[in-house]
């Protein structure tokens, strides 16, 4: 034990152990509470109502990506440069918040008519569709600021207040869902409870953010210019990804039926265990990677280690899913109990996508942006091929499509991260030689 304490890596390992246990335990609570809320919704909503709920949440995700447009990436990249200066970090945060409000208007104008069409196309009445659209607005409003307000805390590794806020929001949502869904099992109420809980959480999150970033600062033109450059490079690809990322739901909503929409939504709830991994990753790993100096060998070593360990964890999760698929499906209820093969396929696609997302998050945190025409081309090609290979009107066919698209995207983004790090090394060597 004494020898271990004198080991040069001892303090680092202990500190990481404390951080991971703290973050992991809090996220287990957050995800467990969220999982219970989700299961209540799955079990108590009718198949058709849950199909509407899935469509609305899918569109909410697309709206969130559109309203961000790469702004949060820009704020993280710029904030990583000035994270020790409260005033400068405040300027970065305020600039990002102001930019996002403007993007939100365009997002609403584009997304809500599409959602209205999909709801009506899948059997919703005008009243139901209208109520669902109205219920999305509070949830969307909350997403405009929460991801940005978290950045000062993440950069300063102030984990405890962030975790407390997430737990409080999850418990608040569960309380509201449990108190309404037994009496009023409607999709729009389930969506509304999530939005109200998040708005309450953001009020408190802003107080925590103020400790590290002065939110009374005004928008900074130079910071806006730097963030805008990232947005300009990111936006075309993000516009495409906000729809291609949920391509399975979009295709089924057009060519399939409400039952298939509900099935893919219910199976997606199981992937919350992987969401736990990504939340811990975004809180602990990405900000630290963003703060690293431009030392190619160090970046290369950490980039490789991170992706390797994530892959091992995902392989373990996928194996458990295969072995215990009957028990997992029992949790979802009788409407979804025969989807064993589909569950494994979905978790396979989700695992591959998670590796891709990890690589993407890491290199974006450095301010590296891939040309959008490359990412779009690399995604469109497997989608087109899949339409000829698989029956995309069925759930299983859509899941095969997901796996093929995710695999191509994973290879692309992991490779791009390595390319940028190796290019950085080459540039440094050239500058030293000159």
Protein language model features and the residues they cover:
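N-terminal membrane topogenesis motif
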Residues: 1-33, 87, 94, 205, ...
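Interfacial segments at transmembrane-helix termini and the short loops linking adjacent helices
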Residues: 12, 16, 117-135, 258, ...
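Signature of the first transmembrane helix
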Residues: 13-73, 233-259, 406
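Membrane-water interface segments that mark the loop-to-transmembrane alpha-helix transition
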Residues: 15-30, 56, 65, 69-116, ...
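Transmembrane helix-bundle signature of multi-pass secondary active exporters and lipid flippases
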Residues: 57-65, 241, 264-283, 313-317, ...
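Helix-loop junctions and terminal segments of transmembrane helices
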Residues: 68-84, 154-155, 213-214, 271-296, ...
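Hydrophobic alpha-helical transmembrane segments
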Residues: 128-134, 138, 163-211, 268, ...
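Membrane-interface junctions at transmembrane-helix termini in multi-pass inner-membrane proteins
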Residues: 140-164, 348-375
């Amino acid at each position: 034990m004494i020898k271990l304490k004198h080991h040069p890596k001892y303090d680092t390992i202990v500190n990481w152990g404390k951080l991971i246990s703290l973050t992991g335990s809090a996220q287990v609570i957050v995800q467990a509470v969220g999982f219970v809320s989700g299961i209540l919704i799955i079990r108590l909503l009718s198949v058709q109502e849950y199909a509407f709920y899935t469509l609305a949440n899918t569109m909410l995700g697309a709206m969130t990506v559109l309203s961000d447009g790469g702004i949060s990436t820009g704020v993280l990249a710029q904030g990583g440069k000035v994270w020790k200066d409260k005033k400068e970090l405040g300027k970065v945060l305020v600039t990002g918040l102001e930019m996002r409000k403007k993007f939100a208007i365009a997002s609403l104008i584009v997304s809500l008519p599409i959602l209205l069409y999909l709801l009506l196309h899948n059997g919703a009445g005008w009243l139901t569709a209208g109520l669902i659209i109205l219920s999305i607005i509070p949830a969307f409003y909350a997403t405009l600021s929460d991801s940005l307000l978290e950045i000062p805390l993440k950069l300063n590794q102030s984990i405890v207040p962030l975790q407390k806020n997430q737990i409080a929001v999850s418990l608040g949502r569960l309380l509201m869902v449990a108190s309404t869904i037994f009496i009023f099992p409607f999709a729009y109420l389930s969506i509304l409870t999530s939005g109200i809980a998040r708005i309450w959480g953001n009020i408190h999150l802003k107080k925590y953010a103020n400790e590290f970033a002065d939110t009374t600062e005004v928008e900074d033109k130079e910071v806006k210019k730097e963030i805008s450059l990232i947005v300009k490079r990111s936006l075309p690809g993000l516009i495409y990804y906000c729809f291609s990322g949920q391509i399975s739901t979009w295709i089924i909503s057009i060519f399939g039926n409400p039952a298939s929409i509900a099935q893919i939504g219910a199976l997606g709830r199981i992937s919350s265990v992987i969401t736990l991994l990504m939340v811990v990753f975004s809180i602990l790993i990405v900000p630290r990677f963003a703060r690293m100096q431009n030392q190619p060998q160090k970046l290369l070593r950490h980039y490789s280690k991170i992706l390797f360990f994530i892959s091992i964890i995902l392989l373990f999760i996928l194996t458990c899913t295969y072995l215990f698929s009957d028990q997992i499906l029992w949790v979802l209820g009788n409407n979804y109990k025969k989807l064993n093969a589909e569950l494994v396929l979905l978790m396979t696609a989700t695992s591959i996508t998670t590796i891709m997302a990890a690589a993407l998050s890491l290199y974006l945190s450095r301010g590296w942006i891939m040309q959008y025409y490359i990412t779009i081309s690399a995604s469109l090609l497997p989608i087109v091929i899949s339409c000829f290979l698989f029956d995309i009107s069925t759930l299983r066919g859509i899941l095969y499509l997901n796996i093929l698209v995710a695999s191509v995207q994973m290879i692309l983004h992991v490779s791009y991260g390595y390319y940028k790090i190796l290019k950085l090394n080459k540039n440094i060597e050239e500058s030293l030689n000159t």
